[in-house]
């Protein structure tokens, strides 16, 4: 695997995404994600913003991604919807040379006004200047179901 797989994520990424869930109408969005290194720390700060085709804000989240050991990853995420996620998982290199980070929630926190979310899974795949991801979610009475997919291109280092 790359000496520091987190370094492969550093920069700003943009591209289109698609969302669906059994309780909502499918939708598309434009996304900007930024991963910023914290000097001297094995961690990246994370920010994400999505907009509609007309440029209206849809969703945002922020957090931190870090490695804990050679192939272990941890991710914490906070959303303005009142949902927080704590994830653990693995970082590995697949046969093509891409780095894959598989994460599953170990805790989902909810404010009193947040919609019910009981579990979240995230998979990130970094292959050069392309970042793809998949998000699954168990929420509002549904079991773990695919929710979001996107393919982003690096726009800055």
Label each residue range with its predicted role.
Residues 1-157:
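Hydrophobic small-molecule pocket/channel-lining residues, especially in calycin-type beta-barrels
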């Amino acid at each position: 695997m790359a000496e520091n797989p987190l370094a492969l994520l550093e920069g700003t990424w943009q591209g289109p995404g698609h969302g669906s869930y059994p309780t909502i109408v499918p939708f598309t969005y434009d996304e900007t994600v930024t991963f910023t290194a914290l000097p001297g720390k094995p961690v990246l700060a994370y920010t994400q913003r999505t907009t509609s085709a007309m440029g209206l804000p849809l969703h945002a989240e922020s957090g931190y991604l870090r490695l804990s050991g050679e192939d272990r990853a941890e991710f914490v995420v906070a959303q303005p919807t009142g949902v927080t996620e704590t994830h653990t998982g693995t970082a590995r290199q697949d046969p093509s040379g891409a780095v894959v980070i598989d994460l599953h929630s170990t805790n989902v926190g909810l404010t009193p006004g947040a919609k019910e979310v009981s579990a979240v899974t995230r998979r990130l795949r970094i292959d050069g200047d392309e970042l793809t991801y998949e998000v699954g979610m168990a929420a509002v009475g549904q079991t773990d179901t695919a929710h979001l997919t996107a393919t982003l291109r690096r726009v800055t280092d």
